[in-house]
């Protein structure tokens, strides 16, 4: 899922409805608030953000542990178990976020009845933005694990080439990996190859890791597809809202510049008035003196 945040289209006309949403939406430090916020709704939004922050942290930790295990020829069982526990935590957090997003999703009846309500449209926007962020995070995790799987397969392939001069083709390797059972996988290798015990142990360990990975990827994919279609449908609306938010910031900045210019012009006008008043006063004084002298002489 591509990041839409940096692909805002230029030149779109901003409708009156979107102006209302733009005015109502204030983005600050990752939070969004209505001018008259629904406390319960935004408490749920805050909870979702916190859960997603935990999920993102776990995904980063998973990436680090995968790198460590890939660099270890024969990782200890505790390392593999720790990695699997981390995957389970990620799946659990993913399910929690999915349920939380479902809880704040505006019901169709409510959305239809209050379509013109800024509050309703604000909730739909919040749900859409959070859903998009969640899908992108899950997609990143899935891609990361798929890449990790390929690296494990490559390790097995290298071991087989070293011990068997490449007698096992890539197609045969994939078929053995798809057997679903480590015992079958190992026995298939032993039939036609002379593999050292250490190499066999590593191959078996990598195959077991691949099996766990594939289960995790399938389960995460189910979470991913749950929201992906909806996010794709809402993407256009989110793009417009984001564009309007950025436009609002631009409007504010330009407004501040205009105010500054107006204040400077006001100061200049005030100075001109003072100078004119002084000139008029001096002129009146001179005229008064001239008239006074004329009367005295006469």
From Swiss-Prot:
Residues 38-163 form a coiled coil. The record marks 290 as: Required for neurite tip localization. Residues 1-274 are cytoplasmic. The keyword Disulfide bond does not apply. GO terms for biological process: cellular response to oxidative stress; cellular response to type II interferon; cornified envelope assembly; exocytic insertion of neurotransmitter receptor to postsynaptic membrane; exocytosis; intracellular protein transport; intracellular transport; long-term synaptic potentiation. Keywords: Cell membrane, Cell projection, Coiled coil, Hearing, Membrane, Neurotransmitter transport, Phosphoprotein, Transmembrane, Transmembrane helix, Transport. Residues 200-262 form the t-SNARE coiled-coil homology domain. Expressed in all tissues tested including adipose, brain, testis, intestine, liver, heart, spleen, skeletal muscle and kidney. Residues 154-298 are annotated as: Interaction with CENPF. It is a single-pass type IV membrane protein. The chain crosses the membrane at residues 275-295. One of its GO terms (molecular function) is SNARE binding. Gene3D superfamilies: 1.20.5.110, 1.20.58.70. Found in a complex with VAMP8 and SNAP23. Detected in a complex with SNAP23 and STXBP4. Interacts with SNAP23 and SNAPIN. Interacts with VAMP2. Interacts with LLGL1. Interacts (via C-terminus) with CENPF. Interacts with DOC2B. Interacts with STXBP3; excludes interaction with DOC2B and SNAP25. Interacts with STXBP4; excludes interaction with VAMP2. Component of the SNARE complex composed of STX4, SNAP23 and VAMP7 that interacts with SYT7 during lysosomal exocytosis. Interacts with STXBP6. Interacts with STXBP5L. PANTHER family: SYNTAXIN, SYNTAXIN-4. Belongs to the syntaxin family. This is Syntaxin-4.
